[in-house]
Amino acid sequence: MTSQRQSLLDHFGELTPRMRRFREAVLDERPYVDGERAVLCTESYEQTRAQPPAMRRALMLSHILDAMTVYIEPETLICGNQATKNCNAPVFPEYTLGFVLDELDLFEKRDGDVFHITEETKEQIRSIAPFWEGNNLRARGEALLPEEVSVFMETGLFGMEGKLNAGDAHLAVNHRRVLAEGLRGYEERARRLSAGLDLTDPASIDKRVFYNAVLEVVAAVRRFAGRYAELARAQAAEADPARAAELLAMAEACERVPYEPARTFREAVQAVWFLQVILQIESNGHSLSYGRLDQYLLPFYEADLAAGRITEDEALELLTNLWIKSLTVNKVRSQAHTLSSAGSPMYQNVTIGGQRLVDGMPQDAVNPLSWLVLRSVAQTRLTQPNLTVRYHASIDPAFLDECVEVMRLGFGMPAMNNDEVIIPSFIDWGVAREDAYDYSAIGCVETAVPGKWGYRCTGMSYLNFPRLLLCCMNGGVDLTTGRRFTEDHGRFTEMTSYDELLDAWDKTIREMCRYSVIVENAIDLASERDVPDVLCSALTDDCIGRGKTIKEGGAVYDFISGLQVGIANMADSLAAVKKLVFEEGRITPQQLWDAILDDFQSPENQRIQRMLQQDAPKYGNDDDYVDRLVVEAYDSYIDEVAKYPSTRHGRGPVGGIRYAGTSSISANVGQGMGTMATPDGRNAREPLAEGCSPAHNRDLHGPTAVFKSVTKLPTEKITGGVLLNQKVNPSTLERPENKIKLESMLRAYFNRLHGYHVQFNVVSRETLLDAQEHPENHRDLIVRVAGYSAFFNVLSRATQDDIIARTEQTL
């Protein structure tokens, strides 16, 4: 360890001995597939066949919370577990058992995202399988899909594994309201509204079911917390005096929250964790985020400090405890799904900083708790939570400096989002000004108003732009599978101008956008009808007021975005075709097409590949030639996707429509595996570019040029997130002048160029290569994959190689 790194670690301080032990214990856990929830879910579903879906789900959650294993770790100060053991991944048979059954003997043999599984668990899964055959979300979702979209599912063009196999999430609930009112307030409101229903109104029948379901889950959550209170008191009776006092304090908190309003910082943190873990027991959705934790916990922190109930160090320890507990939550995905969510991420985002409105005027929202959250994440240095800082032009300069210091630690956090772009964009979409100023990051780079936004602020169809460009050039036939995807809009070998190709692309992407909407709507309808999540809906405004679940249109706002993959490859491909084929005539259309079909293998085609790679403009270098081309092509999709309402449109929420987003997570690797050679000179099966970042080693003029290229995209329309990854060698930031330069670049990127988002991998190529060869020496090595961080050692070799290949910037 260098002296500079040790100095940096000393700056943030060390974990307390207890939290250091807890962190190590969690890191030592081997993740197992856990069958307990699946068995309990099946027991409940077998007994509730006649119940309406909302009540059936409520009774299921109630049964699970009453019967599941509960435990309190010896080092923790807050309690609540998702599975029978930390880091185990529960199974959710109501969504699907298909991939679990198919992979029972393969989980331990994976290249990445490995899970262990006992023979007992295998038997549990097999024993419940008959009940769920044809009786789950995946089966019903597939049954709703029309024949015309089956080809896209069969060929893997639409990456819908995450939607068919799991819940939605991708939201933050109203933590502020729960802490102020307790679930008692929700219970009282549901009772009052239910009592006032006119049951001669047909809509009131479903509302009554929903309200009764809310009452059921609130009571279940209260009992669940009570189980921990009872366990804590039992353990206190056998503990030493110091630990007994902690356990009794824990018991007191659990007897109160989250049913009653929180009174102290400790109770507030416990309530937040109960909500976080129970919501992930309810459904299998990821990206369940904490929202603006530094804002809604601040009153409790300040009151406790003033009253002498807590010290800064004690509050810091509770926060580190919360983050270590967050790492205990896990999710098992299908092998196919891991290609787009590599590293077993949970995407539990916490947002700090930004602005708040005071008498209608925006003010810097950085507060003492913002600093403490930043410090706590620096101390734990884990993949959870996914920390995002909201930047704005008047941000405290000292706080920005501290954010850069955390970046230097090299675990990919914090990511930075820009208020100056996101807030106006939300207001343009119809979000109330006070709500727009309260937005938080969700999951990766997606953004939403916590507690008021519907599920899934991102789509999951992953439109693969380079693969569709090849399809467009091939008369509508997919080059990978030979299957027809679209109508024949022309063949590249017969085209005589770039405008012909652009016209064919415009028709192709609009056609494919329509197909993706069909798929997403079918799955949304299946989710609405089959797996309504009552607790999550209750905690989202204004589902109780409307008597509707989120999927039925209960949220105040409801916008979703598609995800687009390979934007930079698309840009570079268009530039190569326009310049080298149609302007300079150095390559004929037939020569380029033959080279693509040959995967650039013959000597002549290797010469063509070098021309494509070296002689055509590349996105990421502030070259208007290529940057304008990708904007023109991207606009076709952005314009088209906005035409299609979601299944919630007109049912209550503001919005109910779609916009674009570039949060492709690690789908660039999986989608690349299904994409043949492309006109930018990329070989078949190689990873695509991720997010809106340039293709690997094509950005040759430093980060400022990258920033300028990225901000030429219509970011004000890409409200679903503009994901930009940058990689910097740690030695670069050891020099004070370079740290200052990075801060100046960030200010210029956000203030002058109006950048949306950026995050940094501060890690050397040498370290990553050594970690591949000697993983035992790098257990704690964390890298930024896309909009999230993951432990390098759990990633597949392909994803590791993709991260290593990224351009290493100099300042």
Each model region followed by its residue ranges:
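Extended non-globular scaffold/tether segments
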Residues: 208, 212-224
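Heptad-repeat amphipathic alpha-helical coiled-coil interaction surface used
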Residues: 222, 229, 233-236, 244, ...
